[in-house]
Swiss-Prot record:
Keywords: Hydrolase, Polyamine biosynthesis. The gene is aguA. It catalyses: agmatine + H2O = N-carbamoylputrescine + NH4(+). It comes from Pseudomonas aeruginosa (strain UCBPP-PA14). Its EC number is 3.5.3.12. This is Agmatine deiminase.
Amino acid sequence: MSNPTSTPRADGFRMPAEWEPHEQTWMVWPERPDNWRNGGKPAQAAFAAVAKAIARFEPVTVCASAGQYENARARLDDGNIRVVEISSDDAWVRDTGPTFVIDDKGDVRGVDWGFNAWGGFEGGLYFPWQRDDQVARKILEIERRARYRTDDFVLEGGSIHVDGEGTLITTEECLLNHNRNPHLSQVEIERTLRDYLAVDSIIWLPNGLYNDETDGHVDNFCCYVRPGEVLLAWTDDQDDPNYLRCQAALRVLEESRDAKGRKLVVHKMPIPGPLYATQEECDGVDIVEGSQPRDPSIRLAGSYVNFLIVNGGIVAPSFDDPKDAEARAILQRVFPEHEVVMVPGREILLGGGNIHCITQQQPAPRKA
């Protein structure tokens, strides 16, 4: 496997949009007891349901530790799901896995960003994180794909969304946070994104969703549904702490033009809840120094925007919430050619994310 010293853009590679054809989707099996309650068993059932939903549309590869391999293999009883042994610190492959890039000659490579558990020693969610920082490299080794490594640049895949036509959306709350790349200016961060993802226009939303442990990842708040159109988490409740965040994001989106000069169409997606963990759910999480404590008084950052686009389908979270039906209807309206499949997302949310956070698509090779 090669490790180019150039950049993807210089080599003719770009990050494709999520709706472009996939070869497969990657996941990592959950087991960390100080993040997933009851030894991870409820989360494992939730991850298995997500993997099987995706497997209806495309192959899935799930990475599991040596200690969990047999259990994962037994629970993932689907002919379209492969299980491979990879050690990791937790299960957020959107943030620890590679960001795949493609060219027009049929090649696929991967960007291996630096990872510091969403903030390192200044607000990070756990320590150590070395095994998570190795996940992208291991995946690229398995796939025999060239690897671009950014040793001096920290980025999580959930902090970016692209339209595949030169535009990227992110949040200032995350990418400009001093606990990610304090040695870089906004201009330098933008230059890195342009060089490694081949984007030309970057839209900066001020914040992500309220109480998002990742410092406001955009994939829990706003995403592209097609070039020129985005889906934004939304509330009309002026007493909701998300209200001002939604308003500020809408202003930026309405004032922005993408790399093709288009004015963006903004679709609104209601925010579920408010949702909270129960005391019982919190009590099921092991208490370990350096890990994120669980508190039933803290609102969960639930979002229907945290879905995955797969080949011919949309796999989205449900929350046993009155807004579930409306969310499904909106997804079906904005993705009329896709089948919408909703999978219970509460157990994933309790761990700090949702379906988009626990998946990483690998694009299929394409020739122009």
